[in-house]
Amino acid sequence: MRSSVRVLFVCLLVSLSVLTAPAQPGTTQAAVAQSFPSDDPVIRTIWDEGVERSQIYELGQVIMDLIGPRLTGSPGMARANDWSVAKYAEWGIEAYKEQYGTWRGWERGISHVDLISPRVRSLEGMAAAWSPATEGPVEAEVVILADAGNSVAFESWLPEVSGKFVLISRPETNCRPQDNVEWFARPETLARINEERRQAVAAWRQREENTGVDRQVLPERLEAAGAAGIIRSQWSAGWGVNKIFGTRAERAPVFDLSCEAYGLVFRLAENGQEPVLRVNAEARFLGEVPVFNTIARIPGSAQPEEFVILGGHYDSWDGSSGALDNGTGAVAVMEAMRILKAAVPNPRRTIIGALWNGEEQGLNGSRAFVEDHPEILDRTHVVFNSDHGTGPVTFIPMQGFAAAGGYFGDWLARVPSEYADQVTLEIPGSPESGGTDHASFLCAGVPAFSFHVGAGRSGEVSTSSNRWDTSIYTWHTNRDSFDKIIFEDLRDDAVMTAMLVYLASEDPEIMPRDRRMMTEGAEWPKCRPPARSSAESNR
């Protein structure tokens, strides 16, 4: 999920408006008074179907709670693919899995880490994705990544890691979020904390550089030297949240500890107090397994060989449930397709609903789709991408397509003002080169647009998913769970998306490919090939 875009010129349509929320979780109220700017009966049917008979709560509960995280190559991702195909079939929508490659298969089991000396305490933490298992509980002493003066000194130190857990992350000087410090600290205290953090960041960066080993492969180097395991902490700068990513280690388990737990262990080791950890990690490597996108289609009636594509990535990191990144996007895609099947069973153009896989490893599923289907690119009217977390859609960049603003202006003028009035268009915008799946189409010259959440605490328009502190508290974290979803906003996003897809499907002509004049030194992004196996991974 990308967190920002460049703003060049913004066409403001109007400001925020809020719909009445569901009376209780899992239910929706009847459509409240709304402003339909046209007499189009399909728009009214979409509204009624999406508001009065919404299924977003049920879809979200199954995806986030029952299926859970959807790490590429995991059984969870495979279950999600199979379930969505079956659910589409229940709605009478043609759907299938389309293989685009293979990936390293891995299944997470139970993981646990305890401090057993100099005192006993269970520590908050979990194994990294694709971490090797232990053969039962493993106890070992702890050492800190050496503050070696150069790579030669680092190589001389390496034998000391044999049989030990190695701490490889910088400890935080304190585990309070910055806004908490700024709110409560005296000016002199705030200045001290900020300066300590600045110095600590610079010193640790130098320590890493002095090893002569790239940060991404450091765990593998320590593993080769006989480390019992790797301990890190990727704090997300908020209360109780860490980013949980993967590892390429093949023997030594890799654990992420909370900010507080990591700081405790680090200080004990730093002060010569000889901490000992007991680590237990269960996991199964499943070999190289096939990976799929889920593709659904509502065939067009008049121009079936032209397409409107609605997509969002289905895969997630597995530190939690992958709710806001991007379970909400997957729910919005499926619910919009359900609504469209009920309200527009015979659209003018073929509508494709795509649940992409492998986005978190480099947009691999969508890049493969673009590479595998060159025949549809010139006949695709528009691509909509849903990967914005939670909150109402309030900002849509036009991605450098000269005609896009006119199309979006026309579509938004025909949807209820409760939706249109909250949307700001960036005209003409600039093409994004990565971040989420619409970029796979942009580089090929296909008009593709990603929805964004807008206003933050002060009400300013923003291009990032900051409305609910997403970048700190849910984006790739151990707290990205079902309870973070704002369901009335997700309902409204799915309904508005269905309306935009319907209106685009009925346009007389497909959107022109004319591009804005790029600023000096800027180029239209070039397409990158997908990684079709874990061996080809570029992340």
Name what the model sees in each region.
Residues 118-122, 135-142, 149, 159, ...:
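Metal-dependent peptidase/peptidase-like ectodomains
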Residues 58, 338-364, 383, 514:
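Short helix-loop-beta-strand segments that form the rim/entrance of peptidase-like active sites
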Residues 8-20:
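Bacterial N-terminal signal peptides
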Residues 34-74, 100, 110, 237-247, ...:
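N-terminal capping segment at the start of a domain
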Residues 200-212, 216-219, 223-224, 229, ...:
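Active-site-adjacent substrate-binding region
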